Each structure stands twice: as C-alpha cells, then as structure tokens.
Amino acid sequence: SEMCIRDRLVTVLLGILIFIDDYFNCLTVGSVMRPVTDKHNVSRAKLAYLIDATAAPICIIAPISSWAAAVTGFVEGEDGFEIFIKAIPYNYYALFTIAAMILIVALNVDFGSMAVHEANAAKGDLYTTPDRPYANATEDVIKGRGRVLDLLFPIITLIVCCIIGMLYSGDFFKGVGFVDAFSGSDASVGLMLGSFFALIITIVFYAVRRVLSFNESCSCIPEGFKAMVPAILILTFAWTLKAMTDSLGAKEFVAGLVKGVSGGWLSILPAVIFLVAVFLAFATGTSWGTFGILIPIVVSTFSGTNHTMMIISISACMAGAVCGDHCSPISDTTIMASAGAQCNHMNHVSTQLPYVIVVAVISCVTYVIAGFVQNPIIPLIIGLSLIHI
C-alpha cells in the first residue's frame, strides 16, 4: 500500500541521516520506526533489511563517521582522509546497495524469501516463522513529553559538533582554509570531541525540556559505553592483526607478487581484492578487521606507482568488507540490525542474502571495468543500469 511505501521511505531517510555510526544507526532507526512499520504491516525481516542496508553502506561513504576514522587509521604514509574522500565514488557496493534499496521500496517489489515474509505481513503475520523475539515486550515509554524535536535535535547537534571537531583538529581556527582543515583533520579526535560536546548539549537540552532529568541522562551513559565495547574490541584486534601481518612481511610479499603481474592482469586486481575482502569479512564477521589486514597491503603495493589504482583498490577493499559484513550471520552490524528490528536473526540473514548477492555480482563486474578505465563514472552508470534492469 501507499502507506507502507511511505513508512519504508521514511525508514530509509532516517537511516541515511544517521551516518555517524552503524550501531547508533541500527538501534535508533529500529526503535523509532518499528512501531510505525508494525502498524502498517511491514514485516520485521523487511525492516531489518532496511536498517542494515542504511547502516554500514552509509557510514562507509560518510566522511564524518566512525568508519571513516577507522579506515584513515589504517592508511600509512598517505593522507588517509584525502584517500577516503577520493575512494567514495568508487565504493560501488555501498552506492549500489543504497540505490537498489530505494528502487525496491519505491517500486514495492520483493523477491526470494523476503517476498514470502512481506506476503505474510500483509495478512498480519510480521514474523512468518514461529520464533517471535520480543513479541511480548512492551515499548519503553520514557516520558510523555517526548516530541520529534527530541529525536532530531541530538542527531543534528552530533553532526554539527563532529564537523566543528574535525575542523578544530585540522587547525581551521588557526587560519587554515576550510578544505585543507577538513582534509588534514584527525577524524578520530574530531569525532571524539564532537560526540563529547554533543552529549553535554543534549543532556542540558533534555533537562531544560524536562524530558529527562540530569540523573536519568547520566544513567544512560554506561549503557552507551556497553553497546560500544564490541566495536572497541574489534578495532583493537584489527590493529593487532595489522601488526602481526606487518611483522610477517605480508605487505612486501604481496607487493612483490603484484609488481610481477603484467598490465592486463593488474587491471582485474580491484575485483580480486573485492572478492577476497567479501570472503574475509564474511568468515570473520568484521569489516574493520578486514580493513586492518588488507588496506595496509594495498597501500604498500601501489604507493608511489599508480595512485588511481591504489584508490580503486582501497575502495574495493572497503566495499568488499562491507558486503561480507552485510551478509555474515556472525557480523556485529547484522546482529544489531536484527536487534533493532526485533527480528529473528536467521530470518534477517536469509531474506537479505539474495539482495546482497545481486548487488555484489554487479559490484564485482563494475570493479573489473573500473580497473581498465580507471574512471568512477562509467562503471557507476553501467552498474546503476544493471540494477534498474
């Protein structure tokens, strides 16, 4: 129905708006949109897909995000933030996932097991399978005074504060130009400062509005820290893996192999890197760990030789990591999307997989083309055309 399409589009829009962090995205979009989509008979599996498809794919192409900070931290000997920006047009999996999701929602089409879930939801069964996680749970109502502003204000404040924080870390307030300050910023420092001040402002805002008292707001902080512990551990282990591969000389070994490869075979390297990243992220369930292993190898392989090919290959690594993470049943983001939608986890994985495979195949084809043309536009147009077909 028209109401269902509108609800899905609002879910997508909210997911795109919350690009700072994928955990924050999954939990916020899920808790906000779940009562609305339930009311208009959107299956929990479809909601989980919409949440998951606007989490990592949005964060990996957003310069102001925890993912950008993680990626730039793995790029050594180069301007990590500048490379991240240049890699965005080549991040085909993320771009095609967002495009495919919008097309699916706008045209109201589904295929595979998702079509079964949506057909059952139209009859009032939002779960399809007997397992109904949180079926008897009641939605937490914190205060009756809550308004739309209470949701939008913290998000907008967080984005603005993070931008200011990144400009500050890039010495913008010491006379450096806007673009130079942004490209020369330390994303991790900027996000940390921005998040801290956004938290303070939000606590004061809620206290003034009498939505949450100071004590109630402060009691939420430990819960927030707990939610981020898995991400902190993943990043720590990713850095450990990076140090181990560095010690083993993996970068030099791969660089030596690639230098012996002739031009034609070199052009398909981005597609190979994409596939390796997909399988590595799928097996480990972590895209950040995949970044930590592959990005330093890619940088050392192409550094000082073919800068464009390095950017395409780094982007292929990021896209493949997100793709593998997207369909892995042990991925933290996939688990968070299931939790946000309160959907059976394996239902979410099985219904999302056909969509992921279609976009992954198209992305792999576009990386083969990108390796030869070394231009982001032509493969992008071809990929979008294939999605539309």
Locations of the language-model features?
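Core transmembrane alpha-helical segments of multi-pass membrane transporters/permeases
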Residues: 1, 16, 146-155, 160, ...
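Short, small-residue-biased leader/transition segments that mark boundaries at the very start
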Residues: 2-5, 389
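Alpha-helical transmembrane segments of multi-pass membrane proteins
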Residues: 6-20, 30, 40-67, 81-99, ...
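Short amphipathic alpha-helical coupling elements at transmembrane boundaries
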Residues: 31-39, 49, 86, 216-227, ...
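Juxtamembrane and boundary regions of transmembrane helices in multi-pass small-molecule transporters
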Residues: 58-137, 318-387
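Interfacial loop-to-helix junctions that mark the boundaries of transmembrane helices
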Residues: 83-91, 176-194, 259-264, 372-381
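Long, contiguous bundles of hydrophobic transmembrane helices that form the permeation core
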Residues: 97-184, 196-220, 340, 344-353, ...
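C-terminal transmembrane helix pair
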Residues: 229-233, 237-241, 245, 262-291, ...
